[in-house]
A protein has these predicted regions:
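A short, flexible beta-alpha/helix-coil linker loop
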Residues: 9-14, 65-69, 128-129
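Active-site proximal beta-strand in glycosyltransferases
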Residues: 3-4, 112-132, 137
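Conserved small/polar residues in nucleotide/adenosyl-binding loops
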Residues: 143-145
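A short, charged, and often flexible helix/loop element on the N-terminal side
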Residues: 57-86
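Short acidic, glycine/proline-rich loop/turn micro-motifs
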Residues: 14-18, 70-72, 131-136
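Short N-terminal targeting/anchoring amphipathic segment
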Residues: 89-104, 108, 118-120
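N-terminal subdomain of nucleotide-sugar transferases
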Residues: 1-52
Length: 145
């Protein structure tokens, strides 16, 4: 199976404890490593980081912003990230997309609808909801439980 992992806002292979690096990073890193034992896994981030390839695990940074940028300032790069994904990867070759954090989920949903690729979304945080409902930021009708 060919799996695309999207971690838009932070590099899962970055230094833990710096900037936005924490539990999400550890989770994406470890699940990607485990899945690569029996699958081909491609992990993509928008945060600047060093690319690498191993047997069944490839990591790519699309270099859209430096580590440490606030999440609010990262949002403006979402559409550019999606365009770069389409330019740099044959998305049709992925069997499934796993999106991490709500920003990645927005991109995965668009790709899923356009390319008919199933996707999984893991929130990792409910912080956006704790800040209060903001219609411009989140369309709650997209959330199905």
């Amino acid at each position: 199976m060919n799996i695309l992992q999207i971690s838009f806002h932070t590099s899962p292979f970055g230094s833990i404890g710096k900037f936005d690096s924490g539990g999400l990073n550890v989770y994406v890193q470890q699940i990607s490593k485990q899945l690569s034992n029996e699958n081909n896994v491609t992990v993509v981030t928008a945060e600047k980081a060093e690319n690498f390839k191993t047997d069944n695990l490839d990591f790519y940074s699309l270099d859209l912003f430096e580590p440490g940028l606030s999440v609010d300032d990262k949002e403006i790069h979402l559409q550019e990230f999606k365009i770069k994904l389409e330019e740099n990867f044959e998305l049709e070759n992925f069997d499934i997309i796993h999106a991490h954090y709500w920003l990645s989920g927005l991109v995965a949903k668009q790709i899923s609808e356009e390319k008919n690729i199933p996707y999984i979304f893991t929130s990792h945080s409910l912080g956006i909801f704790l800040e209060g409902y903001n219609k411009e930021r989140v369309d709650l009708s997209l959330i199905h439980i």
